[in-house]
Every structure is written in C-alpha cells, then in structure tokens.
C-alpha cells in the first residue's frame, strides 16, 4: 500500500481528477487534503489518513458496495444447485469487503437450507481461516493474498477434495488458481466475483461458471466522471 500511495503522490500535480480503484488506495486522505483542487474517485473503499484513521474529504468521492447482498444470492444459488451438498467460499484477505462476501454467502446457504430444505454444508478448512482487521477469527477459507495463484489452487483443491462441487471465489488474482483447480476436477462449478467471469470459466467445450456476483464499478466511475465534467462532485 505504501508504494501505491506514493504512486498517487508522484502524479497528483499533473491531473485534475484521479481514479483510485481498490482498497489499497484508502490511504490517499492526506494527499487529498494537501491537494484540495484535485478530485479523487476512490473505488471499493473509504478514505483514511496516513495512520489508517477514517476521514472525510470534500474532494474524495468514495464508493463502496454491500458485498453481503451479492454474497447472499451467491450462497442461495450454490445451495440450490449443489449436487454434492457441500459448498465453500474462497477469499483473498480478511478485509471488510471480503468478510462481507463470506458472511453474505454463508447466510444465503443457510437461508436456502431453512426455506428450501437444501441440506447443504458450508465447508471451511481451519488452517485457512481468516483474521479480520480487528484481529478476530472469522473462519472461511482465505488464501492470504490477492495475487497468489499457487496457493489459490491449493485451497481450491483442498475444498474439492472435501467434496465441494460449487465454490464462490472472491480472491482477486489468487482466484485464478481456484479456477484452475475447478477446471482440473471437471465436476465443479464456480461463482465469479465483481465482474462477469464467464470467459474466465471456459474449459474446453464446457464452462465452470455457475454465475457471477457483479459490482458494475465501471458504470459508477463513469457516472461520477460525468458529474465532475458537468461541474458537480
């Protein structure tokens, strides 16, 4: 994150609007305060100062999403479609957005079990349990990185070996490894995350994607850029 924030600092004098996509940009608050004539669009996180304290800046438009809602429907879909009656969620790091996805998914499975008698088990491997920003163990299956395909594949294969036939993957680049594990298994479906991952699911003449949970971030960024162009913020 420090390198990311420095990258913003290096270019801030050259632009009127800077779009910062991702949680790693949350610490731009101090830069924004020091550059009140530059508008910042912060995607998928809220701004903090250099010490991680939440702040509000008139020149930062921060957009966040209710991941738990999309995760809920992913959980319902997984429970309703699972044939093995075992499903799981694989996430990257236990940041709030990922924990929201996890809890939403689990709630969706539990709801389907209660309302539709699906009888589906949520599989968690204790050695991959996540620890959130408050140092609380949140369970789940966390790769520990958003850019570790090798470990993603290991986690995915471990869950498949436990009998899971549907995996909800919210793990960034690490999720590519989970996709590979699912493709190699041949009888596993995956729920994609943030964008439509249908093309990523291609596996010969088949496709492993059951559905995808969308944030449609590009539309929200475009909307705010248009607002700035029209003189608003």
Label for each model-derived stretch:
Residues 1-233:
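A residue-level marker of the well-folded mature domains of exported/periplasmic proteins
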């Amino acid at each position: 994150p420090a390198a990311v924030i420095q990258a913003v600092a290096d270019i801030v004098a050259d632009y009127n609007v800077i779009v910062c996509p991702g949680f790693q940009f949350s610490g731009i608050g101090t830069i924004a305060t020091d550059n009140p004539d530059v508008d910042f669009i912060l995607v998928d996180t809220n701004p903090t100062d250099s010490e991680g304290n939440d702040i509000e800046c008139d020149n930062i438009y921060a957009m966040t999403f209710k991941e738990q809602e999309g995760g809920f429907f992913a959980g319902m879909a997984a429970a309703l479609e699972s044939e093995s009656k075992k499903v799981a969620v694989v996430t990257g790091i236990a940041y709030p957005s990922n924990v929201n996805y996890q809890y939403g998914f689990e709630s969706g499975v539990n709801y389907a079990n209660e309302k539709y008698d699906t009888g589906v088990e949520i599989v968690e491997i204790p050695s991959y349990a996540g620890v959130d920003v408050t140092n609380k163990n949140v369970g789940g299956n966390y790769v520990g990185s958003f850019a570790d395909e090798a470990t993603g594949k290991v986690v995915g294969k471990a869950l498949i070996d436990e009998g899971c036939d549907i995996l909800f993957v919210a793990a960034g680049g690490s999720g590519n490894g989970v996709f590979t594990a699912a493709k190699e298994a041949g009888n596993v479906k995956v729920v994609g995350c943030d964008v439509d991952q249908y093309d990523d699911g291609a596996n010969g003449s088949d496709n492993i994607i059951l559905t995808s949970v969308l944030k449609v971030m590009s539309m929200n960024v475009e909307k705010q850029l248009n607002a700035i162009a029209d003189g608003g913020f």
